[in-house]
A protein has these predicted regions:
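Domain-level signature for proteins that mediate thiol-based redox and metal-cofactor handling
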Residues: 1-191
Length: 191
């Protein structure tokens, strides 16, 4: 089995491509060892001690190293854990855990106004068709969280969370795109 590795715009995060599906649907972001308890693979990666984030995409796993940790030391251990997991063909999640994770919109306190339904549908469609595929190429994901008075709220996950260029991507790329196609959008914010 060959697991390819790609760099991401976030120097602390590497994207690992096992050559097979990782998630059947959706994505899953683990920001702590406690969150990772839902997945044997994520738990094993966090057990290395130098991992601060794990993200499962459709066909990749992004791993974020702790500050000051070099990938030359960490990468062989991560590859070993990934290889063992995928060769053993064990489930990605514990039986009691739900794998698919797109947080409910009201988690961040944003309740969409039903009067904005058409605008919100346009925003979600653009995010799904134009933004998420590009962000997935960089080892991350972006999730719609809400729309209020011209402001769009998005959650960055995986390699995008904590990436030095994520604010530029959000403002120069995503905000410009949404403003161009949806005139009601005045600003985009990360939550």
């Amino acid at each position: 089995m060959l697991i390819e590795t790609e760099s991401t715009p976030n120097p602390a995060t590497l994207k690992f491509l096992p050559g097979r599906a990782v998630m059947e649907a959706g994505t899953r972001d683990f920001a702590s060892p406690e969150e990772a308890e839902a997945s044997p693979l994520a738990s094993a990666l966090f057990s290395l001690g130098d991992v601060t984030g794990v993200f499962f995409g459709r066909d990749f796993v992004s791993v974020t190293a702790a500050p000051g940790v070099g990938w030359s030391d960490l990468k062989p251990d991560v590859l070993g854990i990934l290889m063992d997991h995928f060769l053993a063909d064990v489930p990605l999640f514990n039986a009691a855990s739900a794998g698919f994770s797109v947080p409910p919109e009201d988690d961040a306190g944003f309740a969409d106004d039903p009067a904005d339904a058409d605008v919100i549908e346009q925003i979600k469609e653009l995010i799904e068709t134009r933004v998420r595929p590009a962000v997935a190429n960089d080892g991350g994901d972006i999730v719609y969280r809400g729309f209020d008075k011209g402001n769009v709220y998005l959650k960055m996950q995986g390699a995008c969370a904590g990436c030095p260029s994520s604010s530029a991507t959000l403002k120069n790329g995503i905000e410009s795109l949404l403003k161009h196609y949806v005139p009601e959008v005045t600003a985009v914010h990360a939550v």
